[in-house]
């Protein structure tokens, strides 16, 4: 992958011409809350490369994500969306028998992904659960965390959609799925398998889905987007429209340093 992803330098080429697929983060990269980032729609329309939207957010279905993007003016569909919920469900299906019960800590969209791969989503450890999948939901409370804990302590496989400590909102950073994962970790002494960025599975699935030979990861967070790209030997672009700043880049460990940096998507 790393050899195939080394673009041939060309002084006449724009950045995007060196790559065949853009793997784009969502919040902070192409939109902020309910609004597209200024210039993002036009910047993406200018390209001829394939554009896939890759998100750690497991709370919405690919169709809901695509609908939101289309409503904001982006030209896409659900086939170009890769979510950590899809990846987590795939990881479960590869490790436990078809029809197995899985405690779902998360939204109905996450439960739907579990069902789509031939597993049985449940909300109680007492329903014969052999696995737990954990993704963000604003409704997550003690009761479902207790069910997850009981299942894991009983030997259930544990897959987390992501371990993002915070979640961007229009009012600022709020607790993310990683904060809830930490609670279950503390109660079980176990570590989950992780589907989303910066772990490799979501990047691997995005590359497989897109058929990319020279992908470029585009995102606003050093600790997820850029670290995930570096972990899988993929070129990366940090845009300064979200969480991480230019100062953060200067302070970052080598594992979180982007190959390219730009104020916004116009850099493409």
Model-derived regions, located:
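Asp-based, Mg2+/Mn2+-dependent phosphohydrolase catalytic module
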Residues: 1-26, 31-46, 58-82, 89-268
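Conserved phosphoryl-transfer catalytic core
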Residues: 49
């Amino acid at each position: 992958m790393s050899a195939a992803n080394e673009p041939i330098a060309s002084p006449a080429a724009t950045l995007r011409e060196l790559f065949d697929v853009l793997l784009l983060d969502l919040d902070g990269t192409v939109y902020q809350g309910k609004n597209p980032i200024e210039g993002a729609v036009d910047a993406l329309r200018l390209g001829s490369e394939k554009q896939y939207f890759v998100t750690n957010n497991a709370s919405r279905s690919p169709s809901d994500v695509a609908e939101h993007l289309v409503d904001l003016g982006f030209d896409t569909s659900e086939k170009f969306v890769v979510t950590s919920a899809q990846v987590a469900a795939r990881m479960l299906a590869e490790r436990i028998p078809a029809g197995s019960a899985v405690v779902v800590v998360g939204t109905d969209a996450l439960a739907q992904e579990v069902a789509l791969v031939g597993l049985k989503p449940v909300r109680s450890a007492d329903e014969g659960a052999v696995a737990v999948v954990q993704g963000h939901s604003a409704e997550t409370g003690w009761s479902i965390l207790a069910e997850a804990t009981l299942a894991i302590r009983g030997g259930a496989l544990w897959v987390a959609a992501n371990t993002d400590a915070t979640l961007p909102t229009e009012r600022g950073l709020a607790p993310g799925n990683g904060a809830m994962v930490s609670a279950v970790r503390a109660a079980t002494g176990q570590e989950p398998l992780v589907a989303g960025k910066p772990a490799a599975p979501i990047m691997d699935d995005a590359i497989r889905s897109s058929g990319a030979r020279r992908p470029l990861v585009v995102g606003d967070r050093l600790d997820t987007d850029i670290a995930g790209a570096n972990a899988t030997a993929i070129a990366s672009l940090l845009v300064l429209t979200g969480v991480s700043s230019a100062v953060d880049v200067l302070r970052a460990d080598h594992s979180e340093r982007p190959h390219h940096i730009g104020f916004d998507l116009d850099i493409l």
